[in-house]
Amino acid sequence: QSAEVTYSWSKAETKTSNALKLHNMAGTNILSPNKFMDDEWNFVDVTAGPYGNVYALTQTGLIYEYDNSGNLLFSFGGRAVSNDRYGLFTSATAIDLDEEGFVYVLDKERGFVQVFAPTEFAMLNHRAIYDLEKGNYVESKKIWQEILRLNGMSKIAHIGYGKSLLR
């Protein structure tokens, strides 16, 4: 867990909303229903990354990454139905990260760990969010511009770029 966020999740046998919670220092769940995907309830593991991001793993192998403000950054993974494919899981059971941002996911049924390397795009997003939160607006603005060059449809980049202009 990061010093800035505390996370918890409840494993449910039936569908429930807000199974994953992300608490700020005031104890408020910042994954409010309007920020959370209500259709996901089958979380099996959660871990925090080096920037305070939370990575949540579902039983179906979906991986969600939230920033420490509760915004969904990325989702990837999924269930392997009939054949083996990298990035898909038969029975995902655990998730962890190392200090370089590599994501490790255990597939219990297949008996191995898949490793996901952070992409340049993901690393740029992490750095831009970090710089913005630390008040490094000039540096953050440059990174947001690069992110928008790579993906002009990124909602988070548009919001981050706008915030960097408010210095």
Task: Give the ranges of each region predicted by the language model.
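Alpha-helical linker/edge segments of TPR/alpha-solenoid repeat scaffolds
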Residues: 166-167
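Eukaryotic scaffold repeat domains enriched in small/polar residues
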Residues: 1-163
